[in-house]
Structure formats: structure tokens, C-alpha cells
From Swiss-Prot:
Subcellular location(s) per record: Cytoplasm
Native source organism of the sequence: Salmonella typhimurium (strain LT2 / SGSC1412 / ATCC 700720)
Gene encoding the protein: ulaC
Domain of life: Bacteria
Chief location: cytoplasm
Entry protein name: Ascorbate-specific PTS system EIIA component
Length: 154
């Protein structure tokens, strides 16, 4: 499942969202996947439990979080949601706070998680200017166009 296709088909982009805590921000992304029938509602609690156990493991770059749980924690099919926050939030990550871009990922197996999910997100942000380009997006179509341009350049 391609990041762009998943976002378009699942209508799972929310821009300039407002959240007061990192937990609320994560829930926005998970709720988009629940609405698209990608994950069960329990996927949200699984992510929170993971943070309790391992810390903010999914904050992977300055300003960028990739919330995800394990396949057996309520994943129905592979999919992504993308959320940008109006106001960046602290996720208690030593190096990469504050966060204002969340790409929530659900993968049906570990292989898909690694090869499909993480690689597509790495490719999107290989050009660091894409962080600010994404922050500037105000419509879902602008996000999809940015991903298209990035894929065409790769």
C-alpha cells in the first residue's frame, strides 16, 4: 500500500489540527484510520501502552512522529493517516520535540511495516524542505501533490 494511495482512498489527512496534548494528537491520527476501517479503536490504547513501556519511540525526526502499534493490536489492513498540528506539541523526546507532523501507520505484518511504511516516509522527508512544504499545505490535494512531486523526483 502506497502512502499517497492510502491517504487519498481513506480520506485520512487532517491539516492544522488542534490538540492540547500529544495523546490528543495521536488520537486524531488513529481516529482517521478507525473511520476508514483500517484499525480497530483499541489501536489507540496500544500506542499509548507502547509509549508507557518504551518512551516516545515513534518520534523519529525533529518535528515528526510516526505513531504505530503492532499488527496484532487491532490492524485490519495496511494504511496511513497524516496530521499536521496548528501548534507543535511536546512528546517528551530528548532530541526531536516539539512535534507538528504525525504520520500514523498501521501495517498487517512486520515486513510491510519496515519495507513499505518506514521507507516511504523516509523517502518523503529525504528532502528536508518537504517538512516545511508539508507544514504549508492547507488542503489534502496539496499534500497528495507534494507526495507525487517527491515520488517523481525519486
Amino acid at each position: 500500500m502506497k502512502l499517497r494511495d492510502s491517504l487519498a482512498e481513506n480520506n485520512s489527512i487532517r491539516l492544522q489540527a488542534e490538540a492540547n496534548t500529544w495523546q490528543e494528537a495521536v488520537k486524531i491520527g488513529v481516529d482517521l484510520l478507525v473511520a476508514a476501517d483500517v484499525v480497530e479503536p483499541r489501536y489507540y490504547q496500544a500506542i499509548l501502552d507502547g509509549v508507557e513501556q518504551f518512551g516516545p519511540y515513534f518520534v523519529i525526526a525533529p518535528g515528526l512522529a510516526m505513531p504505530h502499534g503492532r499488527p496484532e493490536e487491532g490492524v485490519k489492513k495496511t494504511g496511513f493517516s497524516l496530521v499536521t498540528l496548528k501548534k507543535p506539541l511536546e512528546f517528551n523526546h530528548e532530541d526531536n520535540d516539539p512535534v507538528d507532523i504525525l504520520i500514523t501507520m498501521a501495517a498487517v505484518d512486520a515486513n510491510t511495516h519496515q519495507e513499505v511504511g518506514i521507507m516511504q516516509i523516509v523517502n518523503l522527508f529525504e528532502d528536508e524542505a518537504n517538512f516545511d512544504r508539508l507544514r504549508a499545505c492547507r488542503t489534502a490535494q496539496e499534500v497528495l501533490d507534494l507526495i507525487d512531486r517527491t515520488n517523481a523526483a525519486a
